[in-house]
Structure formats: structure tokens, C-alpha cells
Amino acid sequence: MKPTIALIGRPNVGKSTLFNRLTRTKDALVHDLPGLTRDRHYGHGKVGSKPYFVIDTGGFEPVVDSGILHEMAKQTLQAVDEADAVVFLVDGRTGLTPQDKIIADRLRQSPRPVYLAVNKGEGGDRAVLAAEFYELALGEPHVISGAHGDGVYYLIEEILENFPEPEAEEADAKHPVFAVIGRPNVGKSTLVNAILGEKRVIAFDMAGTTRDSIHIDFEREGKPFTIIDTAGVRRRGKVDEAVEKFSVIKAMQAVEAANVAVLVLDAQQDIADQDATIAGFALEAGRALVVAVNKWDGISEERREQVKRDISRKLYFLDFAKFHFISALKERGIDGLFESIQAAYNAAMIKMPTPKITRVLQTAVGRQQPPRAGLVRPKMRYAHQGGMNPPVIVVHGNSLHAISDSYTRYLTQTFRKAFNLQGTPLRIQYNVSENPYENAEDKPKKKPLRRVSLSNRIEKREGRKEEKNRFKKKTKVSVKKQFSK
């Protein structure tokens, strides 16, 4: 098992910067605003042959009794319980604070080994920076710089030397990865908690509470899965803080990293243009899609009918997706939603045999041929699979550039029904067999081979005739002269 290291400390001491250093990524948002990383964030790292997990926590505010900072403190304590080792970060520039002392008191009660790291120590005297932190009674302080990497390697190496070498493992198998997307405050984190059965993601009544995209691994019926809880995507004009701008980018990246996108809508609000925009982004990315209409239990029957009409009118392009009307707070409809997520993943990663694809194509053409485009009728010869996530079918033939969009939709529906491709986009590509010399300029120039060879033969024949004539003139003797002698 890989050891798990939790990064703990008060706000703005450099935990996210150190997280990025340990994972060699920029997964955690880094900004000079206290309390920016408001949830646990998981990452992978490796020193030599020893891999490890890292948990980046929100800033620990142990003296706050209510509000979102209190929720962040509870999340931090849960991260400590999950970890195998704890790195307690303090700020070497600011020095020792009363809040550091309170956090140290909490950590001394934990059975986990705690390593004290004095961050932002670049350019300073290590002994001077570490001196005042001996008061915390957490062992030898490690002076590091998360931004520049000074001392980080030796800190992690010391932590990992207390854990055995990992056994050889097989390559990680591919498994479903779901990105939970949607506008702010529609219940995405509540839905993730309902699926997982625990309050792993902060769900607070504040739009944009989850600013980072949280990757959460879990198992269901013995199979591994990963859920990505993205930051709420705001309308561009409402993204005022630089932090929220970063979060929108993270949400888009999460969709790219996922197999399936779960679009969460709020039944208590009208279907907005931004809902369609977010769905369109997932569609353009080629991701399988499941739609969860949340807060369904809190609206009237009349409102429900109105929501369904709005969905069919504004989200008409999601005809391939499965819609679920759920209540994440009361955990209603979660099982059916998860079944559709699994089905969408299976459809996105399907492998279709070429003979069957070609038979389906020939059956579709036999039932309805593509319409003529002028004097030309497209001819489809065979088809094969060209990719997965989303599935791509490549059709080969002649004059396929003349196929209309309506006929492409007909083929899409035919293939979707034949292979049960529910929940995933399906792309059809046409590979046209064209004449490479269709343009006159591209045609090769004909060489006058016969004409050249014929003229050569004529010249040779005429030459032989002339040579004969010359020989006859030289050897011709008169008969009379012979007898007269």
C-alpha cells in the first residue's frame, strides 16, 4: 500500500505550493488569499522507487466554531485520520503564532507521526528560522521552501524511510472516471456525498464552495471508480475573483480527464443558457453524459411539467443522454443514476467488430439509400471503428462528401440502436476514395513512347536502304566489259 501524507497548517503557509512540488503538478489552486484551498485534494507522488499519496487540506482554523472555516477544520481532522503521516507546515517568515500552537496541541493527540516543516525558508539561516519552533515539541523542524524545492526531497525521504518498500504491482487498470459538472450551488457536492455515503466534499450554502476539482477514489461492488467534483461554472461576467477564474479552467480540465460527465441541473431554477453551454462543452469534448435534475422533491407537479418542457426545448441536442430526476439531499434516485453512469461508460468504451459494423451499414443503406447530389449518388462500401470515448465509426466509399447531415443523423441513430450506445456521443467520419488525378493539372504528362520508337525504326530502315544502294553502286560490273577482255 502507498503511504498517505497529509499537509496540515493554518491558511496561506504554502500547503498548495508544497502539494504541487510533491506531485509535480499544478492541481491545487495557488493564490495569496487565505483559505483558498477549501477542501481536501488528493495527488500522487514518487521519490525514487517509493510512491505515495498526498492530501492537500484547507487552512486549519481550529478556533472557529461555525461557518465554512469550521467545516474546513473538520475536513482537516478527517484528513489526519486518513493519513499515514502528517506534515505540519508553519511560516518561517511570519514566525510562530498562537494558532500554530493550537494546531500543534491537536496534532500531538493524533497517533500519526507528525513532521514539522518550516516553509518559506529560502535565503535564510536555517538554524535561526528553526529555533523558535522547537517550542511546539514536535521534533526536529525541517526548514524547506515549497516554492523553490529546498529541503523538500530530504523531508519526504525521511518520511518514507519508515514505510516498507512497496510490492511490485500490476499496471493500474482503467476504470470509470466521472466529472460532476454544473452551475454553482445546484447540489454537485451533495450528490457526490450521497454516492459515497460520507461528507467528503464540503457542501455549504455558498455558491462556489468547491473551488478546486476534487478527485475521489472509491469502490462500488468491488470495482474501482473515481468521481471528480468540479468547481461551479459561473457565467463569464460573474467570475469576478481571479480564484474563480482559475476554478472554471479546472472544471473544464476535469471534463477532459473524465470518461463520463454528470451534468447537475437545479429543478427549482429555470434551465439557463449556461446549462446548455456547459452541456455543449462536454459534448464537444466527446464525453458520455448523464443528466441529474436535482431538488426534484421540492417542486410542484406543475413545475415539474414546466421543467421537462424546458429540457426538451433547450437541451434538445442531448437526445442520447439519460435524464434522472433526483434528490441528492434525501438520496433519492441515486441507484438509478449510478446505473446510467455505468451504462454510459460502457457505451463510451465499447469495442465494435468491423464485420458487424459493415453489416449494420449495409442494412441501413439497403433500407434507405443516401439521396443523390445532382448526378452523383454516394456509395458506401464498408465501415470500421476509429476510436473510443467517444466511439468513432469510419465509413469508406465514393462521393461521400455529398452525404447530407440528415442522412448522417439517420446512420447515427441506426448504429446507436444496433450497439445500444446510450449515454455517449457517436461520431461518424467519412473516408472518401478519390481519384488522385481528378484535376487536370495533377495528371502526368504522356510520353510519346510509340512515336519515338517508330521514328527510330524508320530511320534505321532508311539507313539500311541507303547502305544497300551504296554497296550496289560500288560492286556493279558490266557484262560486256568482262567478255571483251
UniProtKB/Swiss-Prot annotation:
Renumbered residue ranges of the record's region Disordered: 435-485
Residue ranges, compositional bias (Basic and acidic residues): 457-469
Protein's name according to its UniProt entry: GTPase Der
Domain KH-like, residue spans: 350-434
PROSITE patterns (alphabetical): G_ENGA (PS51712)
Annotated HAMAP family: GTPase_Der (MF_00195)
Binding site for GTP 2: 182-189, 229-233, 294-297
Gene Ontology molecular functions: ATP hydrolysis activity; GTP binding; ribosome binding
Provenance organism: Neisseria gonorrhoeae (strain NCCP11945)
Source species taxonomy: Bacteria, Pseudomonadati, Pseudomonadota, Betaproteobacteria, Neisseriales
Keywords attached to this entry: GTP-binding, Nucleotide-binding, Repeat, Ribosome biogenesis
Primary role: GTPase that plays an essential role in the late steps of ribosome biogenesis.
Quaternary structure (record): Associates with the 50S ribosomal subunit.
Name of the coding gene: der
